[in-house]
């Protein structure tokens, strides 16, 4: 039996292509949704851009038929605009002057009319609660939602390696079938590896020493940059060795790196350190510059209305980047700065020369950036559509680094399963162009107090 989905405005704003995601079912767009889209189409940023995309998609439908009667979609479904049910009664506490409540009126009207399987689709949790109170089935938009299996993928695994092939591994690597895992009962079994997955190998006759490798074309090969010290920084744990390998590898082999983890696991710090190494100390000129973006939930949509230049507008967001730069520059024992003023002058020089540039996320959209080391910090506050726009715009020689913690979401309508960082990790898993790693809680490099607080609070 076909279902009838009533679509809220926020679904189309987050995913303007959402009409394509409901198979052969019926879709209803309340008239108030059109009004809201019309009010948003001139807004700066992704909200306005997505509103315009959604409107254009509806216009294409209008050109094919009558939207009041219903227009067939390519997937076999039917979309229509609903202008009726203005007289449907709601509880006194739900005024019909509010857009959300007018959407509820459409849902209730369709249900009272006898249409079966009426489902409201909205990103708004409160609206879903109100719908349930009124006996209306409501769901989140799940087309971009990742599964438990996707969420649990960390980009790293452990395996045992026979002692007699350890030397072979160190020299040229071993095939994946040569290593194995062991369950709690001591039964050995093969492992299903993912391309570019990092591997901690334990020789089966000596569990004290471990070897670090990466899956490449059916083999597990040793890390190439294990002994590197980008801008004088040395790895302090296994996760940082894996981060270093992914970041130091050139954009021709690793154009996309995804690093997830708690605050304090050196995601941003290490990404900046490698970027500085590549731009300052690489004579081949691998990258022209470092660009850092840091999306913010309350900021991106309103940047056009804030006073000042672009850099003045985004300066508050970039303070954590400055903090990491100070730590990186002052960590070099051969170039230790005498005082804070000298260190600040050096950082100012780096920005003035354009070696590091900071950009608002909206200013990246639509550009094709070449030979750039592009860091997207706090990427969990991006939508899947935003991440797609960034990755698919990567120019030749550009390396994109997505950093963040899926459990620290600040943006409305996103959660740990629907944010852009998790979505990119799911979609790019297994791609030879994507390297990803999730840092462990014990790999947090903040103070002992901070580490203890993470465990206790």
Spans of model-derived segments:
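Hydrophobic anchor at the beta1->P-loop junction of P-loop NTPases
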Residues: 259-261
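N-terminal pre-P-loop "Q-motif" helix
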Residues: 232-255
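Conserved glycine(s) of the Walker
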Residues: 266-267
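Active-site-proximal, substrate-binding regions of enzyme catalytic domains
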Residues: 3-119, 125-230
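Conserved P-loop
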Residues: 270-345, 411-432
